[in-house]
Each structure stands twice: as C-alpha cells, then as structure tokens.
C-alpha cells in the first residue's frame, strides 16, 4: 500500500479525479480529503473527463470547502459533446466552484490504439475550440490534456481566443514544446511521471519553468509517483512529486509548496477568506 511522503505544509493538487479514485459521494470525498490533509495538502482540484464525471466533480466541490472542480469532456470522448452537453457545460462553467474548463485538448495516442472508441482528431479539435470559448466567456482557466499532439495543440491554442490562464496538465512534452509554452505564458503542471527514472528531460523542464508558471498534480488514480509507481494514486501522495520537483529546482520543498499554492489560488481564482 502506498504511503504519503513526509508531511509538507501548503501542498495543493492541481488535477485529480476523485470519482475515478472511488470518491463518488460526499462522505467518501471527505475521507480522501482527510487523508490528503494529513499529508499537508490544503486544496484539491477534481476533474471530470466526461459529462457524468464532471457532474460528480462539481458535486464533490460543493460538498467540501477544500475541493474545487474542473468540468469538460475529455478529447477522446468528444463525440459526447451534443447540444445538451454543451448547454450543461456552459451552466457548469458559471458555477463558482468550477474553477477551470477541462480537461479538454487533443489525443492522437488513443486514436491509433483504440480508433473505434476514440473521437477522430477533427472532432477533438472542434470540441477543444468549444471548450476554449466557454473558458473565455466564463473567465475561467483552460485545462489542457495533450497526448502526442504537440503541433496541432500549439496551432489551435495559438489561433484561438486566449483564456486568462492555460494549464498544460500532466506536462510530458519535449523541451522545445515547454519553451514555446512558457513563452506564451502557459502554466505547466507536473504529475507523478516526473519522478520516473527515465524522465530526466521532464525533470530538467520542471527545473527551468518560471516558478509562477508551475503547478503540481497527482492525476490520480493514475501517474502514481516513485516509489509506488503502478499502485493506485490519490491526492495524499502528491508530496513525493513535490519533493522530486523541489530537488530538480534545487530549492527547499517548503518554499516550492508555498509558491505552487499561490499559483493554484491565482490560476483558479480562489477567493481568500
């Protein structure tokens, strides 16, 4: 069973899937948050990857003061984006606890590996443009999923209207893409894969990102960090990723956590009590 890292104050999880972790009601959401609190995690953004899970993400955010939500339809499921789904997502975007529109984006990996189950790239692109428009209209951050679609993603983001913040979640692209994203002012969010042994380039990217363009996430129940790679992930385990990123940046993890928490609050427009 994975264990949290040492207690680190002021941690935040910029992208997790509480419903996929098993937290599908208020009581179970509270259990996950309690475990996260014990590891130093103060705030969590839970994400929907389809309309049903977006509803659960918003319900989780409504049920707990330390949870906020991101709502969208995942690019692989973009064929679900019918008129009713579009109308509902616009409603969700206006909710005060929906802090980002996501995850949306482009994914060619699953087009190649599961073409019958995955929306074609043209459908994904149209859905992405819809979500961008929703984010701009609502004044919310845009949360991007990108899997092996760097050039097309940069093209779409470059010619579409610009949301206040664009987050590249679970950043995994090459250094050249990172440099372009940084130059455009995007926020790069790093998940547990930054801890993987063979991901030295990703650690170098985490080291070069300006501190005010950096978030950390679990992407739970996926992307469990070393030393528990392959096990089921949850927000309580984000400290392992924070320690890795702090080491890559040669800075104390406490300072990293404070800076990333400030970014979380700014990008997601979290009102101070």
Residue ranges and their predicted role:
Residues 1-273:
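Mid-domain alpha/beta scaffold segments of enzyme catalytic cores
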């Amino acid at each position: 069973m994975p264990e949290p890292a040492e207690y680190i104050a002021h941690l935040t999880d910029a992208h997790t899937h509480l419903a996929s972790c098993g937290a599908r009601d208020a009581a179970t959401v509270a259990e996950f948050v309690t475990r996260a609190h014990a590891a130093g995690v103060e705030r969590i953004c839970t994400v929907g990857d389809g309309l049903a899970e977006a509803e659960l993400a918003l319900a989780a955010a409504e049920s707990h003061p330390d949870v906020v939500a991101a709502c969208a339809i995942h690019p692989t499921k973009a064929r679900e984006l019918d008129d009713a789904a579009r109308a509902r997502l616009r409603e969700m975007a206006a909710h005060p606890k929906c802090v980002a529109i996501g995850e949306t984006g482009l994914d060619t990996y699953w087009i190649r590996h599961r073409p019958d189950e995955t929306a074609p790239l043209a459908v994904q692109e149209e859905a992405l443009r819809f979500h961008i428009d929703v984010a701009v209209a609502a004044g919310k951050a845009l949360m991007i999923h990108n899997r092996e679609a760097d050039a097309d993603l940069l093209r779409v983001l470059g010619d579409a209207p610009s949301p206040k913040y664009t987050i590249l979640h679970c950043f995994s692209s090459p250094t050249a893409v990172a440099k372009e994203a940084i130059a455009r002012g995007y926020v790069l969010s790093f998940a547990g894969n930054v801890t993987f042994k063979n991901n030295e380039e990703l650690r170098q990217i985490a080291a070069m990102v300006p501190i005010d363009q950096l978030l950390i996430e679990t992407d739970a129940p996926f992307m469990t960090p070393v030393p528990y790679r392959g096990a089921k992930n949850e927000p309580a385990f984000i400290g392992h990723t924070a320690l890795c990123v702090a080491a890559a940046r040669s800075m104390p993890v406490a300072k990293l956590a404070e800076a990333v928490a400030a970014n979380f609050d700014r990008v997601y427009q979290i009102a101070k009590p």
